[in-house]
C-alpha cells in the first residue's frame, strides 16, 4: 500500500455526543493523546493532510464528539468506488475500561508503507477496546470480504475473528478478561499486581501507565490550559474541564439502578454502588482496615506515616486532610456556616451540627456492648471503651501519668507548663481548663444549675452538690 493512500480517517475513531458522554476522564485523555500523536506522526512523515476538525477541537480542549458522523470508508479510491454500496456494520461489544495506552500499531514510515487493510482496521478495533466503550456496541463500518481484492481477503477474515472475540489466546486468570496480544495482557496484569513502572523524575512517584505520568507532570509545571468560560476555573486536562462544566449545567448522567441516585461523574457512581454491595476493595497493609474509596485509604495511611501535608498559615498547625484544614481555618475566621434549625446555634462543620442535633432528638446511636451505656458520638464510645479495657494510651512525658483521652493529656500538660489560656473577662483570672472557667463565671453570674432534690438548695458546681447530699445520707 502506498504512503499517499493512507488518510487520517483510516487511523482515527469518531464519537457521537452520547458515546462521548459515556467515557470517563481517563478514557477521554487516552483518546486525546492517541489522536494527537497519530496526526503528528502522519505530518512528520510528510503525509500531507488538512487538519481535521476533531484535531482542532482536541487542541482547543473542546469536546470532540461529531454531529452527523460520516461512515468510515476504505483505504484507497479504487476499493472505495468498488465497495461504495456494500457496507456491513459489524457491532462489536468491547470490554470494560482499559486504563493504559498499550502498544498499538506502530505508525512508522515502514509500517504505513506495508500495512494492509486489515492491519489498519485491527488498529482501529484495538483503540476502541482501549477506550472501553461501555455497556454497548461500537459501530465499525467495514466492507464485506467478497467485494475486496484477493490480496486482503484473508487479512479481513482474520480481523473478523478478532472482532468477534474468537482469537483472544491471552486470558487473565484473575478476572477472566482475554486479549489478542501478549503485550496487552502484560499491561493489564499490572492492574492486579499493583506494578507501577513509570516514574516521575520530579518527585519520584510511580505510575502504572505512561499517560498517567504525563498528566501528573502538570502538577509540577502548574500548567492548566483548559479554562471554564462560566467561572474562569482552569484545569490541566480537558476531561476535568468537561466534568467541571456539569456543575454549571446540573447534568448528572450516571444513575444508580439500585436507588435511582444520579451523579455527575462515573467514578462517583462506582463509589456509591459499593454502599449497596458492601464492597471495600482498598485495604490498609499496616492495620488491615478496608475502605470503599482509594482516596479514603490514601488519607488513612497518613495516620501510620504521620504525614500532615496541609498546614494552616495562621498558626502552623498541620492536618492529614485538606477538609480538616478548611474546618480548622474557620476557628480563625469565625465562620460557622452550619446552623441548627431547632435552637439557632451555629457550627463550623457539618459533623458538629449532626452531633449537636442529637441533643434535641435524644438519639444515642453508639452503644457500649460491655455496660449498655449509649453515646451521641462514636468518638465518645471509643473513649468510654478504654475504661473497660483499662487502656490509657496517652502518657505524659514529664511525669509518666497516663490518660484515656488525648484531650485529658493535653489539659494535664498545662500543669507542667503553667499555661492558663482561659481568662475571665470579668476579673482577669485565668484557668488551665475551659470547664474551670465555666464554673468560675457562675460566681459573677450567680448561676446555680445543680439543685438538691431533697431540700431544693442550689449550687454552682456538681461537686458542691455531691458534698451537700452527704448531709442527707449521713455520709
From Swiss-Prot:
* GO MF term list: DNA-binding transcription factor activity, RNA polymerase II-specific; RNA polymerase II cis-regulatory region sequence-specific DNA binding; zinc ion binding
- Asked if the Swiss-Prot or TrEMBL record annotates the protein with the keyword Transcription regulation, the reply is yes
- Asked whether the keyword Magnesium is assigned, the reply is no
Say where the protein is mainly found.
Answer: nucleus
Keywords, in A-Z order: Cytoplasm, DNA-binding, Metal-binding, Nucleus, Repeat, Transcription, Transcription regulation, Zinc, Zinc-finger
The KRAB domain, residue ranges: 6-77
Gene Ontology CC entries for this record: chromatin; cytoplasm; PcG protein complex; transcription regulator complex
- Write out the domain note: The KRAB domain is responsible for the transcriptional repressor activity.
Q: Which PANTHER family match?
A: TRANSCRIPTIONAL REPRESSOR PROTEIN YY, ZINC FINGER PROTEIN 143
State the name under which the record lists this protein: Zinc finger protein 383
Protein's organism: Macaca fascicularis
Amino acid at each position: 500500500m502506498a504512503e499517499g493512500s493512507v488518510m487520517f480517517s483510516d487511523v482515527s475513531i469518531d464519537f457521537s455526543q452520547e458515546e462521548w458522554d459515556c467515557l470517563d476522564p481517563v478514557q477521554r485523555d487516552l483518546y486525546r493523546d492517541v489522536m494527537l500523536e497519530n496526526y503528528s506522526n502522519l505530518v512528520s512523515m510528510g503525509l500531507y493532510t488538512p487538519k481535521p476538525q476533531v484535531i482542532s477541537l482536541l487542541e482547543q480542549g473542546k469536546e470532540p464528539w461529531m454531529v452527523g458522523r460520516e461512515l468510515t470508508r476504505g483505504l484507497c479510491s479504487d476499493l472505495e468506488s468498488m465497495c461504495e454500496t456494500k457496507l456491513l456494520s459489524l457491532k462489536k461489544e468491547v470490554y470494560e475500561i482499559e486504563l493504559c495506552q498499550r502498544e498499538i500499531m506502530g505508525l512508522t514510515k515502514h509500517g504505513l508503507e506495508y500495512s494492509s487493510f486489515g492491519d489498519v482496521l485491527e488498529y482501529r478495533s484495538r483503540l476502541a477496546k482501549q477506550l472501553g466503550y461501555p455497556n454497548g456496541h461500537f459501530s465499525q463500518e467495514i466492507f464485506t470480504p467478497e467485494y475486496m481484492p484477493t490480496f486482503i481477503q484473508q487479512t479481513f477474515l482474520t480481523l473478523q475473528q478478532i472482532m468477534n472475540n474468537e482469537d483472544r489466546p491471552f486470558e487473565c486468570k484473575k478476572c477472566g478478561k482475554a486479549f489478542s496480544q501478549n503485550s496487552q495482557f502484560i499491561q493489564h496484569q499490572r492492574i492486579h499486581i499493583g506494578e507501577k513502572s513509570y516514574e516521575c523524575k520530579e518527585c519520584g512517584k510511580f505510575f502504572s501507565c505512561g499517560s498517567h505520568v504525563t498528566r501528573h507532570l502538570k502538577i509540577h509545571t502548574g500548567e492548566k490550559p483548559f479554562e471554564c468560560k462560566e467561572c474562569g476555573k482552569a484545569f490541566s486536562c480537558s476531561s476535568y474541564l468537561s466534568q467541571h462544566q456539569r456543575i454549571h449545567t446540573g447534568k448528572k448522567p450516571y444513575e444508580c439502578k439500585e436507588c435511582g441516585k444520579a451523579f455527575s461523574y462515573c467514578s462517583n457512581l462506582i463509589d456509591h454502588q459499593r454502599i449497596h454491595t458492601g464492597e471495600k476493595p482498598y485495604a490498609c497493609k499496616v492495620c488491615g482496615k478496608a475502605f470503599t474509596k482509594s482516596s479514603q485509604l490514601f488519607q488513612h495511611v497518613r495516620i501510620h506515616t504521620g504525614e500532615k501535608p496541609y498546614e494552616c498559615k495562621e498558626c502552623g498547625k498541620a492536618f492529614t486532610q485538606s477538609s480538616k484544614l478548611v474546618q480548622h481555618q474557620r476557628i480563625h475566621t469565625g465562620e460557622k456556616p452550619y446552623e441548627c434549625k431547632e435552637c439557632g446555634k451555629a457550627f463550623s462543620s457539618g459533623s458538629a451540627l449532626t452531633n449537636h442535633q442529637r441533643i434535641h432528638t435524644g438519639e444515642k446511636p453508639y452503644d457500649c456492648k460491655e455496660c449498655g451505656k449509649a453515646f451521641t458520638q462514636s468518638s465518645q464510645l471509643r473513649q468510654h471503651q478504654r475504661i473497660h479495657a483499662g487502656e490509657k494510651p496517652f502518657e505524659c512525658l514529664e511525669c509518666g501519668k497516663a490518660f484515656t483521652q488525648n484531650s485529658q493529656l493535653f489539659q494535664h500538660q498545662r500543669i507542667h507548663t503553667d499555661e492558663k489560656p482561659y481568662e475571665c473577662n470579668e476579673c482577669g483570672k485565668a484557668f488551665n481548663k475551659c470547664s474551670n472557667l465555666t464554673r468560675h463565671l457562675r460566681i459573677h453570674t450567680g448561676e446555680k444549675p445543680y439543685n438538691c432534690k431533697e431540700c431544693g438548695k442550689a449550687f454552682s458546681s456538681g461537686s458542691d452538690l455531691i458534698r451537700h447530699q452527704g448531709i442527707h445520707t449521713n455520709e
